[in-house]
Swiss-Prot record:
Naturally occurring in which organism (per UniProt): Helicobacter pylori (strain ATCC 700392 / 26695) (Campylobacter pylori)
Pfam families noted in UniProt: MinC_C (PF03775)
Name by which UniProt lists this protein: Probable septum site-determining protein MinC
Gene that this polypeptide is encoded by: minC
Subunit field text: Interacts with MinD and FtsZ.
Basic and acidic residues: compositionally biased ranges: 75-93
Length: 195
């Protein structure tokens, strides 16, 4: 008997664009895109394929119409032409989760997120704001905010400000149950332990 697994996949569909715009998007967002399938609605150029392979991103070239729920986004060209918003005026809100986040659960948010329960293995958290986990963290965390606060870490799947933490960088997080605050200063990762 053939062994198969069924999976639900989140995907980005990219319409025909200038290769430079697509490469810029991929370079800027490759850490986030690790968790998605990228579907190109055209035959992509070799330089775009090189960037996809460099970052080990999953992609598909097809002209076939795919069914699924669509989330409305701005076209890539318009998105890259907009000036960056002034974050001091539009501070993200904070969402607090008092429950455990179970395996298979995915949370995508523009808010700051606080988790009082555990993040189980197989759960995925992606936030544009700061993330604080005061329970056991076994799942994947992708944080684009100014800081990441973790207590008891049992996962090596952590991305902070577009940087995938290496096993060497994750090791200091695994040693005890003290609260650790992760920040970045000029691309240098800073981990402080709070007793």
């Amino acid at each position: 008997m053939l062994k198969t697994n069924q999976k639900n996949v989140h995907a980005f569909e990219i319409e025909k664009q200038e290769p430079e715009a697509v490469i810029g998007f991929l370079e800027k967002n490759h850490a986030l895109l690790q968790y998605f399938l990228i579907i190109f609605k055209y035959d992509i150029e070799s330089e775009v394929k090189a960037v996809l392979r460099k970052h080990q991103l999953l992609f598909l070239e097809t002209n076939r119409v795919l069914n699924g729920r669509h989330i409305k986004t701005m076209p890539l060209k318009d998105e890259t032409d907009h000036p960056k918003p002034n974050h001091s005026k539009t501070e993200p809100k904070t969402t607090i989760y008092e429950r455990h986040i179970r395996s298979g659960e995915e949370i995508y948010s523009t808010n700051h997120l606080i988790f009082l329960g555990n993040i189980h293995n197989g759960a995925k958290i992606i936030s544009e704001g700061c993330v604080s986990v005061y329970g056991v963290c076994e799942g994947a965390i992708v944080c684009f905010g100014e800081c990441l606060i973790l207590k008891e870490v049992k996962s090596a799947q952590i991305v902070f400000q577009n940087k995938i933490l290496s096993l060497k960088e994750v090791e200091p997080l695994l040693v005890n149950k003290n609260i650790k605050i992760i920040t970045k200063n000029d691309d240098i990762l800073d981990i402080k332990e709070v007793l």
